[in-house]
Amino acid sequence: MTLSAQQLQQHTPMMQQFLTIKSEVPDTLLFYRMGDFYELFFDDARKASQLLGISLTQRGKTGGNAIPMAGVPYHSVEGYLAKLIAMGESIAICEQIGDPATSKGPVERKLVRIITPGTVTDEALLNDRQDNLLCSVYQLQNSFGIASLDLGSGRFIINQFQHTETLQAELQRLNPAELLYPENFEHMDLIEHLQTIRRRPEWEFELATSKKILNQQFSTKDLIGFGVEKAEVALCAAGALLQYIKDTQRTSLPHLQSIQLEKNIDSVILDAATRKNLELTQNLSGGFDNTLAEVLDFTVTPMGSRLLKRWIHQPIRNFNTLTYRQTMIQTLIEQDLSSALADPLKQIGDVERVIARLALRSARPRDLTRLRTAFSLLPELQHLIADLPTELVGKLNKEMGLYPELLTLLEKAVIDNPPVIIRDGGVIKEGYNEELDQWRNLAKGATDYLEQLETRERQATGISTLKVGYNRVHGYYIETSRSQSDIVPAHYIRRQTLKNTERYIIAELKEHEDKVLSSRGKALALEKKLYEQLIDLLLPHLQNLQSTAQALAELDVLNNLAERAVTLNYVRPTLQAENGIEIEEGRHPVVEQVSKTPFIANPVMLNDKRRMLIITGPNMGGKSTYMRQVALMVLMAHIGSFIPAQQAKIGPVDRIFTRIGASDDLASGRSTFMVEMTETANILHNATKNSLVLMDEIGRGTSTFDGLSLAWACAEQLAKKIQAYTLFATHYFELTKLPENIPELVNVHLDAVEHGDAIAFLHAVQEGAANKSYGLQVAALAGVPKEVVSNAKNILRQLELGSQPQANLNEKPLQTTLAFDDAQTNQALLLLANINPDELTPKKALELIYLLKERA
């Protein structure tokens, strides 16, 4: 909303001020502080009224039309802000910074910050157990760069890659609360599903501009020291992100002290389909129930919970780091320290985000008490882990640190239970500052004086009901009933008339009022100044405090994984350099927790001689569960966790792929089969011999022969060319012949027992192929009408009889043509129809076979 000077003159001074500030943030809801309310005007008011369900009123007129207005009380604003942020809205906060008592004209106001979904740091507006990331994406030719910033911790990370599939996977992993993109971005289909995306001018992504703003932030000459200088596309994204942060926060960002380049080679790569199908932190319905994180996350600090979820979404390949985590978990179990460590960690809470608010100068009084609590508990934590081997806890102890001087400072400066905000004072402890104590004592002395004045005036006037009081609107007053107003002394000056009472002021009381209000104002101003100075004293320790928060979060995660290992009967997997995945009595970490019946543990053995398991068995027999549990155990091993098994040896794994289940992608116009084939293509293009691949029912979305052909060819490609560790579940029993031609393939099956029309699933993995799929029995269990099931049985018998002549599908399984074409089939059938088998001699029968062979 941009108005000319002439147009502004048509408004009141207050509205002129509003419109001038609003012109700075035309596309953002402006919360304009007026006394005890935040007001919104014009279109902002209409929008807020609709989104928040608050009343839409009017204030004055402009151009002959009433000005729409809506407002919320300042003391409950956070609840409204949280709702708007959850809807993806951005809010600009305009505060009164002038003193109404001394202001001539409108009180001075200033735009202090802009809150967007990706830049929130306020405790009340955040999910404390989930990262809140601002991301930026940029494309240059065939390369993509992505930058992510967690403003609540200062983690600033970039990555650069070349495929849209990787971009899709990264966006799903990061799950940004807000994403920035350049005006000419070509792949809108990959980002438009996100709730909050913001188009930014192309020039903000220029490399020179980006390097300049990044060097300014880190006070460096170049970025070589961070090891990011070659990731130029990612740096473009990072520069635009940092510019956006500076535009919205309008303050320095001292906790942004470095930038880190992530490399895919350091991680076990998970594509978007794999993250979704394995239900790591979100189930298929979008909730948290029955996910891996729900089972593993019993952390006691919010920052620990966030770190664990990052580990789950980004398993690592660094053997030394994984061994350290495993050994630390093992030691915590052996020393029985889990419960002892959990209690102080729980009291420490979320110091990571407290430190970020400290850096942004938005820390509240209770944030300082949380820091004080953390400082007081650090010695206890270090004492608890003092007996652990130095090679395990030496680095942790160093990063955790001790802060006796800061603890003493906060103990002297801040009262035990301060108010939520500093606005009304009452935060700084008595004895911390002599001048503050003097002003406070002067203000406190008012109570004694008022009691003495009331007693004296009652005696002087003879009015026994006379009272001396105070309110924020009218100040101090002497109150009498209206019936006694005719006997008040002449020097009483009427200040306010109420229904049954009269209120007066006298010169002595007015003098006292001026003195008290002056002392209160001076005390409050001094207290706010001391509070800012307190933050200034803490800021030089910012980098060390960030290291402390990271160390505490890691200790919480490792301690949590130790507790989970004991409680859930997990074992330490052996991570080996040799190829292979061998797990004895493995269990699905989630299903075993929610199942009402005992979970059936199963083994898996994959090595150079067993590269692929062809898995057959009944519907509902547990094939998908078995496959997922293998992937989840491998993933858990690569975050350093113990796993649900009796014993395990796991070799190098670079990627995990899953092709399990599919549904129509209506938004992109893709059918179930197209989704299935897209995921399959991704696997066939990107899997390596160290990848773990889960393929479930490939080819089921098309005709039988097409599906069988595709499944056959995919299995052959994975086994012979790619040689990935593969679990290949199928209902095409023809595929069970593949191991006869490819020795690295092995048949396994999940069995079931039939009794009459009933079926019992054993859920146990056995060597060899299954003999049937029990589809009709499962249909009956699902409640399909009996007459339909009965009819299906009859049809099945007919099909089985009719399919006998085509049982040669597996004779030449690796050839392109698996059966006669239509013309050849008709000729063969005609030839056979004209033959009487009883009249054939052995020689004629042999000649007939050769003839059919020639026409095949």
Swiss-Prot record:
Binding site for ATP: 617-624
Gene Ontology cellular component list: cytosol
Superkingdom as given in the UniProt entry: Bacteria
Keywords carried by this UniProt record: ATP-binding, DNA damage, DNA repair, DNA-binding, Nucleotide-binding
SUPFAM superfamilies linked: DNA repair protein MutS, domain I, DNA repair protein MutS, domain II, DNA repair protein MutS, domain III, P-loop containing nucleoside triphosphate hydrolases
Family named by the database record: Belongs to the DNA mismatch repair MutS family.
Protein name (record): DNA mismatch repair protein MutS
Organism in which the protein naturally occurs: Psychromonas ingrahamii (strain DSM 17664 / CCUG 51855 / 37)
Lineage: Bacteria, Pseudomonadati, Pseudomonadota, Gammaproteobacteria, Alteromonadales
